[in-house]
Swiss-Prot record:
Co-chaperone involved in the maturation of iron-sulfur cluster-containing proteins. Seems to help targeting proteins to be folded toward HscA. Belongs to the HscB family. Pfam families: DnaJ (PF00226), HSCB_C (PF07743). GO terms for molecular function: ATPase activator activity; protein-folding chaperone binding. This is Co-chaperone protein HscB homolog. HAMAP family: HscB. GO terms for biological process: [2Fe-2S] cluster assembly; protein complex oligomerization; protein folding. Signal peptide: none annotated. InterPro entries: DnaJ_domain, HscB, HscB_C_sf, HscB_oligo_C, J_dom_sf. One of its GO terms (cellular component) is iron-sulfur cluster transfer complex. Interacts with HscA and stimulates its ATPase activity. Keywords: Chaperone. The gene is hscB. Residues 2-74 form the J domain.
Length: 171
């Protein structure tokens, strides 16, 4: 049973977050190990394993990037173990320029405002790539979606760097 089936959801990128959360709570309640305290050792172990699978499935489905990777894995495309690199020189150049821009934020007259503006720009890029990914997955364009996921991973790392710089500025 795949994660979507576990939660009774259609196998697609777009999903109802509130339905996912309510299904998660219901499954958590149903398979909580405390409910099996008086059960046999085997049943208790199965409940713990089921609870772990439910938690893993929820964490995967609630995160758009992990959900997209999981959808590709259902199509036989494994992104986690891949050695494939992104073959988009324009995107890679843009990423280098963005990282240089982020490094220069701390030298600005108002670094906090510069960081907020930079983060706003990166968030807009992230939304743009997520929208493209959603369309590619809906059209079963698996290889294009895989490239989009690679791009989104770059952007996720950049967002982490923004948080690091923010911590430095506030620290």
């Amino acid at each position: 049973m795949n994660y979507f089936e576990l939660f009774g959801l259609p196998i697609q990128f777009e999903l109802d977050g509130s339905l996912l959360s309510s299904q998660f709570r219901a499954l958590q309640k149903r398979f909580h190990p405390d409910n099996f305290a008086t059960a046999s050792e085997r049943d208790r172990l199965m409940a713990v394993q089921q609870a772990a699978q439910i938690n893993d499935a929820y964490q995967t489905l609630k995160d758009p990037l992990r959900r997209a990777e999981y959808l590709l894995s259902l199509q036989g495309i494994e992104m986690n173990a891949e050695q494939q690199t992104l073959q988009d020189p324009m995107f890679l150049m843009e990423q280098m320029e963005l990282r240089e821009e982020l490094e220069s934020v701390t030298a600005c007259a108002d670094p906090e405002a510069a960081l907020v503006a930079f983060d706003t720009k990166v968030t807009a890029m992230q939304r743009h790539y997520l929208a493209q990914l959603q369309g590619q997955l809906a059209q079963s364009e698996w290889l294009a979606a895989a490239d989009q996921i690679r791009k989104l991973k770059f952007i996720a790392k950049l967002k982490n760097e923004v948080e690091r710089v923010e911590d430095q500025l506030l620290g």
